[in-house]
């Protein structure tokens, strides 16, 4: 292998999942067992947030936090579930302008199936039908957040 090939290999971008883990989990069913017999169509509220923290030169922790609140048609809470799922990722030799995209798109895409499974399982264990969360387009969310941030900075100028 030539020196140029070795240098190129040494500088190749690296994206590696070091560890995935459940950080926090909460489930409440404040009106059970009466809530099990609710016949009206439930209404669900869903909130999602991602947080990224640099741990050292090449490692980042990304957390995906999901809150789900489901209420009956008359507004009584059936259940609430909160999940924070984290991942430690190695991001090395990636251009600095691309790191926010890796942390805001790629990492949440890896974490979301685990969050979906935890939510589904805990809701089932709570006595309800499993809740399957729809896929999320993290790229669209990321780009929308970037546009909002740019617009806010434009207003301040």
UniProtKB/Swiss-Prot annotation:
NCBIfam families reported for this sequence: PRK05751.1-3, secB
Function, as annotated: One of the proteins required for the normal export of preproteins out of the cell cytoplasm. It is a molecular chaperone that binds to a subset of precursor proteins, maintaining them in a translocation-competent state. It also specifically binds to its receptor SecA.
Annotated Gene Ontology cellular component terms: cytoplasm
Molecular function as annotated in GO: unfolded protein binding
InterPro entries, per database record: SecB, SecB-like_sf
Record Pfam families: SecB (PF02556)
Protein's recorded name: Protein-export protein SecB
Known partners and oligomeric status: Homotetramer, a dimer of dimers. One homotetramer interacts with 1 SecA dimer.
Keyword list, A-Z: Chaperone, Cytoplasm, Protein transport, Translocation, Transport
Chief site of localization: cytoplasm
Organism lineage: Bacteria, Pseudomonadati, Pseudomonadota, Alphaproteobacteria, Magnetococcales
UniProt subcellular location: Cytoplasm
Residue ranges of coiled coil: none
Similarity remark: Belongs to the SecB family.
SUPFAM superfamilies recorded: SecB-like
GO biological process: protein folding; protein tetramerization; protein transport
């Amino acid at each position: 292998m030539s020196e140029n090939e070795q240098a190129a290999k040494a500088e190749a971008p690296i994206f590696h999942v070091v560890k995935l883990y459940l950080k926090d989990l909460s489930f409440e069913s404040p009106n059970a067992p009466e809530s099990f017999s609710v016949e009206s169509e439930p209404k669900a509220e869903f909130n999602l947030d991602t947080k990224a923290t640099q741990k050292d030169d090449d490692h980042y922790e990304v957390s995906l936090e999901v809150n789900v609140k489901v209420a009956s048609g008359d507004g009584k809470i059936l259940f609430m579930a909160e999940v924070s799922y984290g991942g430690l990722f190695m991001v090395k030799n990636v251009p600095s302008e691309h790191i926010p995209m890796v942390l805001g798109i790629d990492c949440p895409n890896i974490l979301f199936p685990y969050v979906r499974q935890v939510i589904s399982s805990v809701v089932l264990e709570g006595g309800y039908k499993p809740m399957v969360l729809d896929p999320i387009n993290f790229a669209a969310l990321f780009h929308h957040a970037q546009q909002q941030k740019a617009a806010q900075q434009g207003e301040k100028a």
